[in-house]
A protein has these predicted regions:
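Short polybasic amphipathic segments
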Residues: 1-5
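Short, mixed charged/polar active-site loops
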Residues: 9-11
Length: 136
C-alpha cells in the first residue's frame, strides 16, 4: 500500500517484528472500556516499553507507517474499525478482536504491526475471557 502526500509517494509498512517489551502500545482512553477491559489492557501495557493515550484513529495511522506496534481498544462500533482494518492489513499488520477472531463488527480490537507482537499481547492479557461489552 502507498500514500500520496506533499512529499510524494510513500510506502505504508508496519514495523518489523519485535518483543512486546520493546513495543509502543496506544489506546484512546486509559480506562479502555469496562473495568475488566481496563485491567486486561493494563496487563499488556505494563509489559510494553511505552504506552500512549488519546490518539483515536491516528494510532492506526501511526501503526501503518511503522511508528508504533499495537493499538488496543474496546467498545468500538463496526463503523469505527472498517477503514482502519483495511489500511492496517494493506500495510502488513494484523487486526483481530481480543480473542483472535474477525474484528469487522467492532468491540474489542487488537491492531498489531505483526503476528508476533499480536500473539504476545494476546497472551499477556487481551485473550482473557471477558463478558461481552455493551455498545452504546
Amino acid at each position: 500500500a502507498t500514500v500520496n502526500g506533499p512529499m510524494g509517494q510513500a510506502t505504508l509498512a508496519t514495523r518489523p517484528a519485535r518483543m512486546l517489551s520493546e513495543a509502543t502500545v496506544v489506546t484512546t482512553f486509559p480506562e479502555v472500556g469496562s473495568k475488566t477491559e481496563e485491567r486486561a489492557f493494563q496487563t499488556v501495557a505494563r509489559q510494553a516499553r511505552l504506552t500512549r493515550y488519546g490518539l483515536d484513529c491516528y494510532g492506526y495511522a501511526l501503526l501503518t507507517v511503522g511508528q508504533i506496534d499495537l493499538v488496543i481498544e474496546a467498545g468500538l462500533s463496526s463503523y469505527d474499525v472498517q477503514a482502519p482494518i483495511a489500511v492496517v492489513q494493506a500495510a502488513g499488520g494484523i487486526v483481530t478482536n481480543w480473542q483472535g477472531g474477525p474484528a469487522y463488527d467492532g468491540g474489542r480490537i487488537i491492531a498489531a504491526a505483526n503476528a508476533g507482537v499480536h500473539a504476545e499481547a494476546s497472551r499477556f492479557g487481551c485473550a482473557v475471557t471477558l463478558p461481552v461489552s455493551t455498545q452504546t
